[in-house]
């Protein structure tokens, strides 16, 4: 065993002062002193449980002791009679065994492969024991879940990721998926429960038993987001539902994740075999599947962006040449060839790497180098985490922990350790790049004219710039030179390291060459230089633009086209990553895929880290806005589609925010008890205005109201129980908070909830019954107008149907035509007087006479006026389709409806483009005279004439 270094010997004196008398220094072995000096986690544990140290000294950890975990735990649980005792015993057992594993690892008593095996088997043992205890308890309480033939149904648990692969790290969360075989109901209980209800309740209790922090800590952080549909999907799925999902909707990244899936505690049974057989075709294709290379390349890009966004340095998992790249190398062969090569179907990395070597799929010696690097990195990761039982892969910056790791890795000092580490990671990066590569070719040697270099370095006299800027006018040439000079002055105020200056000096001649070839050179340059000022101290982003010429070209063209895009990029430099791939930059996410994209995006963020979750939501929104704007600028999205995409994006974010708020509220208070006998959450979010009408713009806020269906006198079922209606109020308040909290990426959306019953004076969340009563008995005509453009954007089907029925009933009320006409017209006149165009020589596209709002009022008036005769008019909430309905139902002449639709979309298109130019929504008075005349004529016809 390697002696302790000088810093560690000094630290030992600090350790001695903490030890109780029962652990006197004189009685401790050299091994004990070494481990206690190395690991604060072990130190804290044996101070709390001195008998564990005695056990370690008398019966040191063995390589095969994982075989005894189940029996040891069974003995510990023998006297457990309630969940509180179960939670306590599981936590104490986990800590005791983790101390033994940390001891064995620090002293190199067992091989690193065996450490991974012990960590994984411990987790599986704890999960299975908790599941089995709870299954028996739930069966006693509710009866045994059976299929229609009376055969008992088990809960099967898929361990994903490193848990499934038998490669769990020391301090890790666990990714699980719950499933049960067949539908049916419970038998033998006090009352019958559907199997879905039984397993959902049991799953919730299992997560609580494993995940909830107590005075004894927790067993494992449980992450359920890899299940079908993520947080928005059922907690537990039947085999049939699983099969349908993976056959019809399974994504490449889910296939990638499923490679390592393993059934926890799987004994031989028909159900276990059935689940394995069902999942295998999804993971391993029968044909050689080279499409996976692009999918993995995309994932690699996501990781690189994540490293940049989070500013990760010295990260041995996600950094270049780290653990994740070794996993990618192995899994690319599994996913490409696994369907034809059974030896590649192992869940564990090292056996699969051996199979890859045996099949000669990698050049000679590469597999051996990858194996050595993997074992080195995994040992370093586990030692790092065992210092304080902390989930980290970032190398320490302090002297003590560096000395600890140097000792644990059996190197002389930190310098030697980092040299060996760098060599391993360089080997991994080389193999990774050769196998997966990049879409972009390496940057070509700089062949720019010396003029561009001199222009950047201010080595040209003004007269000398004529050859390179000859196509520009004298004024524009002067503006370009002034912009470059101002930019250099700004840089002088910044602290830029040698590497940053080097990258900038390489980038700027390229940028100037591309920008100055344009006739409008000063326009993009004036918009790009503020962005560069913002990122000069963040070398990774400068390198991105320097190393990827395509990204630089996209930056120039987008900034030239839109100051809004330039401002977004300057405020949020992380968006620069989106410039790397034109396939995604100019192709927005499919309208029905935003929820899934966001779910995948959020999987990278710890579920319990609210700050990171908030930041990720905002980053996702900014990324998607950039893609939509890029497609808009490129002319590939018409105005209707721009709004569709912006609306679907908002709905996906609303869904995620509700999920997050719901999880936080349930963790604090439990669920309202009226949900026990049903699925869903008894909650709905209704979108009004532009959101309800599928007409969002780039900077639109969200008009929302919140509904629930909670009866009176219902309480929540948590330890801190509160009134059910109070729960929904706090849920709505939490949702508002998540939307409005300002992070480094800004707020999510401005949310206006004043359209709720009684406006700002009313309750933030309303029961469905109270909402219906208010609409029937108290609401003003303008509130009924608003209802025309309202729809549920998140909610249970039952509550959605209730809202739709109320909306339909209100809109189909018989109204006296003249009275309605007067009320709608007077409301519009009040709005015009209140908002008043302050630019008398300009036309306000939205608010002025003949503008967008007039068209909206015409459609709302006609729906309220005629829906009692033509109920089909209530079907849609957007103006364009309402105009179609008015023509189809012979309320409005088809030619007039078409002309109003064209005027409406033309005016909205102009608003979108003004937003891209960061210009206000008004134009010269002579603009759109034809459209305005047409709208005024319709207004006169419907809302003025008798």
Swiss-Prot record:
This is Bifunctional glutamine synthetase adenylyltransferase/adenylyl-removing enzyme. Keywords: ATP-binding, Magnesium, Multifunctional enzyme, Nucleotide-binding, Nucleotidyltransferase, Transferase. Involved in the regulation of glutamine synthetase GlnA, a key enzyme in the process to assimilate ammonia. When cellular nitrogen levels are high, the C-terminal adenylyl transferase (AT) inactivates GlnA by covalent transfer of an adenylyl group from ATP to specific tyrosine residue of GlnA, thus reducing its activity. Conversely, when nitrogen levels are low, the N-terminal adenylyl removase (AR) activates GlnA by removing the adenylyl group by phosphorolysis, increasing its activity. Residues 449-946 are annotated as: Adenylyl transferase. Signal peptide: none annotated. Its cofactor is Mg(2+). Its EC number is 2.7.7.89, 2.7.7.42. Belongs to the GlnE family. SUPFAM superfamilies: Nucleotidyltransferase, Nucleotidyltransferase substrate binding subunit/domain. GO terms for biological process: regulation of glutamine family amino acid metabolic process. GO terms for molecular function: [glutamate-ammonia-ligase] adenylyltransferase activity; [glutamine synthetase]-adenylyl-L-tyrosine phosphorylase activity; ATP binding; magnesium ion binding. The keyword Nucleotidyltransferase applies. NCBIfam families: PRK11072.1. GO terms for cellular component: cytosol. Residues 1-440 are annotated as: Adenylyl removase.
